[in-house]
Amino acid sequence: MKQPVRVAVTGAAGQIGYSLLFRIASGEMLGKDQPVILQLLEVPVEKAQQALKGVMMELDDCAFPLLAGMIGTDDPKVAFKDADYALLVGSRPRGPGMERADLLKVNGEIFIGQGQALNEVASRDVKVLVVGNPANTNAYIAMKSAPDLPAKNFTAMLRLDHNRALTQVAQKAGVAVADIEKLTVWGNHSPTMYADYRFATANGESLKDKINDPAWNKDVFLPTVGKRGAAIIEARGLSSAASAANAAIDHMRDWALGTNGKWVTMGVPSDGSYGIPEGVMFGFPVTTENGEYKIVQGLEIDEFSRERINFTLNELEEERAAIADMVK
């Protein structure tokens, strides 16, 4: 058996946390041969801490062979101590009458604190995934607040958009999700994201050619993927928690264990690829190997795609401007 690794999860007693923790503890994220120690963070509020205790009791009651230990805390420095992986799930949701700029600032405070704590106590190789929205900008803030950790260690979750897009394309083309390769999502995890199947194939056949419906792409596909979260809230009365947790598992598993040359989508700090300014936390097609991701290079960006990429980039630049005074 391998040595246990430490996995920190924030917002651990929330909806997504509840869908996530049991899957991490069962080995779905890091493999069936990798023991884990869960380090669980919740806000310093009695109700949340009580709920966290209940979740930990349930984790105990599963008797997972791979769960080598567990702590629950309200202190980020305890939760992130020596963490090898950190899933930052907890964030402040938008309340009634709250402007987006207010939301950015409120979450900015949270992610500055968490970035600083990671900087101070986490493993120097910690892999950080920000799930809490606005995920790209929260990840950017955490990254900027952790100057002693490599910027590449910080990522934002676009895998939910990616997975949503996969299923829509599979259903339209009449192919199996598992057979689709080379689909990607560019930009921000928001309705402005650009899901792109121009390069995608199923069993070697071009999906763009198979679908061959530009009107569907623009008027049905992109709005459906972009507004899927809102559609789920409307239908279920609650936000998409299980599918978000599933996407977080996918993102971390692929980052840790590799994609064998397959493309996946990750929000990563730009290296200037495709004209995206350096440092912007942006969804790109990537491949991963040995715990490192690489942005897929050399893809042609046509006029429609450039327009959509600029649109989502502009939103990210506006978000960055809104919190510019908070991060150096």
UniProtKB/Swiss-Prot annotation:
EC numbers for this chain: 1.1.1.37
Root EC class = oxidoreductase
Annotated residues that bind NAD(+) are located at 11-17, 107, 114, 131-133
Extract the GO molecular function terms from the UniProt entry.
Answer: L-malate dehydrogenase (NAD+) activity
Q: Where does substrate bind?
A: 94, 100, 133, 164
A single Gene Ontology biological process assigned to it is: malate metabolic process
Q: Which reaction does it catalyse?
A: (S)-malate + NAD(+) = oxaloacetate + NADH + H(+)
Residues spanning the signal sequence: none
Q: Which residues form the active site?
A: 189 (proton acceptor)
What does the UniProt keyword field contain?
NAD, Oxidoreductase, Tricarboxylic acid cycle
Query: What protein family does this chain belong to?
Result: Belongs to the LDH/MDH superfamily. MDH type 2 family.
What role is this protein assigned? Catalyzes the reversible oxidation of malate to oxaloacetate.
Q: Which HAMAP family match?
A: Malate_dehydrog_2
Protein name (database record): Malate dehydrogenase
Tell me the lineage of the source organism. Bacteria, Pseudomonadati, Pseudomonadota, Gammaproteobacteria, Moraxellales
